[in-house]
Amino acid sequence: MTTRIDTKFAELKAEGRPALVTYFMGGDPDLETALKVMKALPKAGADVIELGMPFSDPMADGPAIQAAGLRALNAGQTLAKTLYMAAEFRKEDDTTPIVMMGYYNPIYVYGVERFLTDAKASGVDGLIVVDLPSEMDAELCIPAMKAGINFIRLTTPTTDDKRLPKVLHNSSGFVYYVSMNGITGAAIADTAKVGEAVRHIKKSTDLPICVGFGVKTPEQAAAIATHADGVVVGTAIVNAIAGELDEKGKVKGDPVAAATQLVHALAESVRATRLEAAQ
């Protein structure tokens, strides 16, 4: 089965450019604003949307994304409302892939079978569940595959040759290479090392490789784009939204404009990089 993710990356490969994958937190700072951000992302240049599922104990996330999740939870965001966001987005956009990203606990509480049914009905194309290793594929990965939803794995600089085949087994959609160890929003990675890592992973898979963690500026995104099939930006977008909120996390400025202006700049930079490389 071909998903929107497969189709999108095939289109981009034909165009000779990498994807811009944009992450933001579902329900941050509130449901209405977050949905406006989501709907505005493709026009700003996002090729794939990662929709964060807020969770109270996000161990892999840095302070910015933790704060975004807390704002969303405080505003009443639930997994059902995050699925609602996907469904509402799909009423206007049937081509941009949606990948829900987060932790297993909210899905487990919601009910795996129910979640996959509702996710598919809402137009969700892929899942990234950061705390479910390949040894637990039977929990969610294999059921997701059967439901026609891509299950996207994370690889890191410490994923060795013995571990890599296990990580890639049952992976689909794309591979998310975490360009450094630690939490999201940390310092930028060494782009030469990223290039080496991507080439190494590609020896073991035909899936597109997207690189994230630590990409904050258009310049950094462009540097990563020369090595990868996609660049993932999350913390910078979350920070752009947060910069338009008051100390209580309520909207005081224009978070939609702040997010889309950044994404537009990132998209221009990413697209130009590959075009230059191809000339």
UniProtKB/Swiss-Prot annotation:
EC number assigned by the record: 4.2.1.20
Keywords: Amino-acid biosynthesis, Aromatic amino acid biosynthesis, Lyase, Tryptophan biosynthesis
Catalytic reaction annotation: (1S,2R)-1-C-(indol-3-yl)glycerol 3-phosphate + L-serine = D-glyceraldehyde 3-phosphate + L-tryptophan + H2O
One Pfam family recorded for the sequence: Trp_syntA
Pathway it works in: Amino-acid biosynthesis; L-tryptophan biosynthesis; L-tryptophan from chorismate: step 5/5
Self-association state and partner proteins as the record states: Tetramer of two alpha and two beta chains.
Function field: The alpha subunit is responsible for the aldol cleavage of indoleglycerol phosphate to indole and glyceraldehyde 3-phosphate.
Family label: Belongs to the TrpA family.
Protein name: Tryptophan synthase alpha chain
Natural source organism: Brucella suis (strain ATCC 23445 / NCTC 10510)
Native organism taxonomy: Bacteria, Pseudomonadati, Pseudomonadota, Alphaproteobacteria, Hyphomicrobiales
